[in-house]
Amino acid sequence: MPDDLDHRLFAESVEHFNAGRYFEAHESWEDDWRHRAHRSEDWHFLKGLICLAVALHHHANANERGRGMLLRRALDSLEAVTYPDTWVNLDELRDWARRALADPQIIEHEVPRVVYVPPP
């Protein structure tokens, strides 16, 4: 988890994501992502969440090709993150992305939720 993360804004992005407002979640995370060192772990963390949100946005708009490309990017980025699975459910998100890549039909009955527990 980035040390300088604005936890209030991150929580708002999570709320957008979990409410199915994937475009809004992506926009919010992207604002922070742009300021991260390219290819740093923080960069990969935010890129993974952004790509996951955009993949689900593409799915909602019947863009199968875009969904598949962004799911792959999301998984690649999330797999580059070694943060402990303490504040965000990274292992569950990675697992869901793997399953959705193998069988896109799961998106019809199971969408991921980001579980975020801010630090004390």
What are these regions (language model features)?
Residues 38-42, 78-92:
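Boundary/linker segments of alpha-helical solenoid repeat arrays
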Residues 5, 17-18, 59:
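Hydrophobic/aromatic side-chain positions at a characteristic register within alpha-helices
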Residues 62-82:
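TPR/TPR-like (Sel1-like) alpha-helical repeat modules
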Residues 95-120:
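Terminal, low-structured helical/coil segments at or just beyond the last alpha-helical repeat
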Residues 15, 50, 57-58:
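Residue-level signature for tetratricopeptide repeat
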Residues 17, 22, 29-30, 71-72, ...:
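Inward-facing hydrophobic residues that define packing positions of alpha-helical scaffold repeats
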